[in-house]
Amino acid sequence: MFLWYNSFQTKFEIDTYLELSNNMSLCMGCMQEIGDNKICPSCGFDTTEKQQAPFLPYGTILQNRYIVGAGIDTNGESTRYISHDKQTGDIVIICEFLPIGLFSREEGTTEVRINYENRLVYNKLKDDFLNYYRILSELRELSALMNVHNIFEIQTGETGEKACESG
Protein backbone atom coordinates (compact mmCIF):
# COMPACT_ATOMS: atom_id res chain seq x y z
CA MET A 1 0.00 0.00 0.00
CA PHE A 2 1.45 3.38 -0.91
CA LEU A 3 0.11 6.56 0.62
CA TRP A 4 0.51 10.11 -0.45
CA TYR A 5 -0.11 13.13 1.71
CA ASN A 6 0.09 16.80 0.85
CA SER A 7 -2.18 19.70 1.85
CA PHE A 8 -1.96 23.22 3.11
CA GLN A 9 -2.85 22.57 6.72
CA THR A 10 0.08 23.05 9.07
CA LYS A 11 -1.07 21.72 12.43
CA PHE A 12 -0.96 18.04 13.32
CA GLU A 13 -1.23 16.08 16.52
CA ILE A 14 2.30 15.24 17.68
CA ASP A 15 3.49 12.95 20.46
CA THR A 16 7.02 11.52 20.42
CA TYR A 17 6.15 8.59 22.70
CA LEU A 18 2.89 7.58 21.15
CA GLU A 19 0.30 5.84 23.27
CA LEU A 20 -2.75 4.59 21.44
CA SER A 21 -6.07 3.58 22.88
CA ASN A 22 -6.11 0.28 24.78
CA ASN A 23 -2.75 1.20 26.42
CA MET A 24 -0.71 0.20 23.36
CA SER A 25 2.53 2.15 22.84
CA LEU A 26 4.32 2.09 19.50
CA CYS A 27 8.03 2.24 18.71
CA MET A 28 8.67 5.06 16.23
CA GLY A 29 11.46 2.97 14.67
CA CYS A 30 9.54 -0.21 13.77
CA MET A 31 5.88 0.47 14.74
CA GLN A 32 5.77 -2.57 17.05
CA GLU A 33 4.17 -2.46 20.50
CA ILE A 34 6.74 -1.56 23.18
CA GLY A 35 4.70 -1.13 26.35
CA ASP A 36 6.60 0.99 28.90
CA ASN A 37 10.05 0.32 27.38
CA LYS A 38 12.17 3.34 26.47
CA ILE A 39 14.35 1.15 24.21
CA CYS A 40 12.45 -1.00 21.71
CA PRO A 41 13.09 -4.71 22.33
CA SER A 42 12.44 -5.44 18.62
CA CYS A 43 14.71 -2.91 16.89
CA GLY A 44 16.67 -1.11 19.63
CA PHE A 45 15.13 2.29 18.85
CA ASP A 46 15.47 4.84 21.69
CA THR A 47 12.04 6.39 22.23
CA THR A 48 13.51 9.38 24.06
CA GLU A 49 15.21 10.72 20.91
CA LYS A 50 13.61 13.33 18.66
CA GLN A 51 13.56 13.28 14.86
CA GLN A 52 15.90 15.97 13.53
CA ALA A 53 14.79 18.80 11.23
CA PRO A 54 13.79 18.94 8.44
CA PHE A 55 11.94 15.67 9.00
CA LEU A 56 8.45 15.28 10.46
CA PRO A 57 8.45 14.85 14.25
CA TYR A 58 7.86 11.33 15.59
CA GLY A 59 4.18 10.71 16.23
CA THR A 60 2.88 13.27 13.73
CA ILE A 61 -0.63 12.15 12.77
CA LEU A 62 -1.69 12.74 9.16
CA GLN A 63 -5.31 12.65 7.99
CA ASN A 64 -6.21 11.55 11.55
CA ARG A 65 -5.11 8.12 10.34
CA TYR A 66 -1.36 7.74 9.75
CA ILE A 67 1.15 7.89 12.61
CA VAL A 68 4.55 8.97 11.28
CA GLY A 69 7.64 7.30 12.69
CA ALA A 70 11.33 7.41 11.87
CA GLY A 71 12.69 8.57 8.54
CA ILE A 72 14.10 5.49 6.81
CA ASP A 73 15.71 7.08 3.77
CA THR A 74 16.04 10.36 1.93
CA ASN A 75 17.20 11.00 -1.63
CA GLY A 76 17.28 14.77 -2.14
CA GLU A 77 13.73 14.82 -3.52
CA SER A 78 11.78 13.04 -0.81
CA THR A 79 11.97 11.29 2.54
CA ARG A 80 10.31 8.00 3.44
CA TYR A 81 9.01 7.34 6.96
CA ILE A 82 7.88 4.12 8.60
CA SER A 83 4.29 4.72 9.69
CA HIS A 84 1.28 3.04 11.26
CA ASP A 85 -2.21 3.08 9.74
CA LYS A 86 -4.58 3.48 12.69
CA GLN A 87 -7.53 2.38 10.57
CA THR A 88 -6.12 -0.95 9.34
CA GLY A 89 -3.29 -1.58 11.82
CA ASP A 90 -0.86 -1.98 8.90
CA ILE A 91 2.71 -0.73 8.84
CA VAL A 92 2.98 1.62 5.86
CA ILE A 93 5.58 3.88 4.31
CA ILE A 94 4.82 7.59 3.95
CA CYS A 95 6.90 9.43 1.36
CA GLU A 96 7.13 13.20 1.86
CA PHE A 97 8.23 15.57 -0.90
CA LEU A 98 11.26 17.38 0.59
CA PRO A 99 13.50 18.78 -2.17
CA ILE A 100 16.83 19.76 -0.61
CA GLY A 101 17.57 23.48 -0.71
CA LEU A 102 14.07 24.63 -1.67
CA PHE A 103 12.43 24.76 1.77
CA SER A 104 13.04 24.96 5.50
CA ARG A 105 11.37 23.37 8.52
CA GLU A 106 12.18 24.07 12.14
CA GLU A 107 12.89 21.12 14.40
CA GLY A 108 9.80 19.78 16.15
CA THR A 109 7.35 21.42 13.73
CA THR A 110 5.41 20.19 10.73
CA GLU A 111 5.25 23.49 8.87
CA VAL A 112 7.35 23.75 5.71
CA ARG A 113 8.45 27.17 4.52
CA ILE A 114 9.17 27.39 0.82
CA ASN A 115 12.09 29.67 -0.01
CA TYR A 116 10.51 32.60 -1.88
CA GLU A 117 13.02 32.60 -4.73
CA ASN A 118 12.44 28.85 -5.26
CA ARG A 119 8.64 28.74 -5.05
CA LEU A 120 8.02 28.23 -8.78
CA VAL A 121 10.59 25.43 -9.02
CA TYR A 122 9.25 23.87 -5.80
CA ASN A 123 5.65 23.90 -7.07
CA LYS A 124 6.63 22.45 -10.46
CA LEU A 125 8.63 19.64 -8.84
CA LYS A 126 5.80 18.97 -6.37
CA ASP A 127 3.29 18.70 -9.22
CA ASP A 128 5.60 16.25 -11.02
CA PHE A 129 5.97 14.25 -7.80
CA LEU A 130 2.20 14.07 -7.29
CA ASN A 131 1.56 13.14 -10.92
CA TYR A 132 4.12 10.32 -10.70
CA TYR A 133 2.34 8.79 -7.70
CA ARG A 134 -1.08 9.27 -9.28
CA ILE A 135 0.11 7.23 -12.26
CA LEU A 136 1.50 4.56 -9.92
CA SER A 137 -1.84 4.51 -8.12
CA GLU A 138 -3.62 3.77 -11.39
CA LEU A 139 -1.19 0.90 -12.05
CA ARG A 140 -1.55 -0.67 -8.58
CA GLU A 141 -2.60 -4.05 -10.02
CA LEU A 142 0.90 -4.58 -11.46
CA SER A 143 2.86 -6.60 -8.92
CA ALA A 144 6.24 -5.12 -9.94
CA LEU A 145 5.22 -1.61 -8.85
CA MET A 146 4.62 -0.18 -5.39
CA ASN A 147 0.98 -0.33 -4.39
CA VAL A 148 -0.21 3.27 -4.01
CA HIS A 149 -3.53 3.49 -2.15
CA ASN A 150 -3.90 7.03 -0.89
CA ILE A 151 -2.65 10.36 -2.21
CA PHE A 152 -3.40 13.47 -0.22
CA GLU A 153 -1.95 16.94 0.30
CA ILE A 154 -1.25 18.58 3.61
CA GLN A 155 1.62 20.94 2.87
CA THR A 156 4.33 18.99 1.12
CA GLY A 157 3.93 15.97 -1.11
CA GLU A 158 3.84 12.57 0.55
CA THR A 159 3.03 9.01 -0.46
CA GLY A 160 2.97 5.66 1.30
CA GLU A 161 3.17 1.96 0.61
CA LYS A 162 2.50 -1.14 2.65
CA ALA A 163 5.71 -2.28 4.29
CA CYS A 164 6.84 -5.79 3.41
CA GLU A 165 7.93 -8.04 6.23
CA SER A 166 11.14 -9.97 5.69
CA GLY A 167 11.74 -13.41 7.01
Where are the language model's segments positioned?
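ATP-binding glycine-rich loop module of kinase domains
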Residues: 55, 79, 83-135
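Short cysteine-rich clusters marking metal-coordination/redox-active sites
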Residues: 27-30, 40-43
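Conserved alphaC helix of the protein kinase catalytic domain
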Residues: 70, 134-138
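Cys/His-rich microdomains that often coordinate metals
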Residues: 33-35, 47
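A short, low-complexity linker immediately N-terminal to eukaryotic Hanks-type protein kinase catalytic domains
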Residues: 49-68
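Short beta-strand micro-motifs within the conserved protein kinase catalytic domain, predominantly
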Residues: 147-158
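Flexible N-lobe loop architecture of eukaryotic-like protein kinase catalytic domains
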Residues: 73, 140-144
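Protein kinase glycine-rich loop
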Residues: 68-76
